[in-house]
């Protein structure tokens, strides 16, 4: 039932109902931020990545067969590990010079 409501809200957002986004954001923001924080171990980065996740999810259609919850966590995980990898590359480059 919850996943049906999330998809309904997401589809309403795509149809122009901005309040639907606010409901989804309020429902998932803290959960996603906590999830990302456990990966990146930095509160400010987790907050920034969480914002990026919501922007990405709301600008790109969810793939057929995915629930909103699955998709947002998938994007969050990807963005968090991308951040870690980017920092790792920067560190490696700085150490070379």
Please describe what each predicted stretch is.
Residues 1-30:
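N-terminal module of bacterial RNA polymerase sigma factors
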């Amino acid at each position: 039932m919850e996943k049906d409501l999330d998809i309904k809200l997401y589809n309403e957002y795509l149809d122009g109902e901005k309040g639907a986004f606010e409901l989804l954001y309020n429902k998932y923001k803290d959960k996603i931020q906590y999830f990302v924080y456990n990966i990146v171990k930095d509160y400010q980065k987790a907050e920034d990545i969480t914002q990026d996740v919501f922007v990405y999810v709301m600008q790109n259609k969810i793939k057929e067969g995915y629930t909103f919850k699955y998709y947002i966590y998938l994007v969050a995980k990807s963005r968090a590990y991308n951040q870690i990898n980017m920092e790792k590359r920067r560190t490696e480059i700085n150490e070379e010079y």
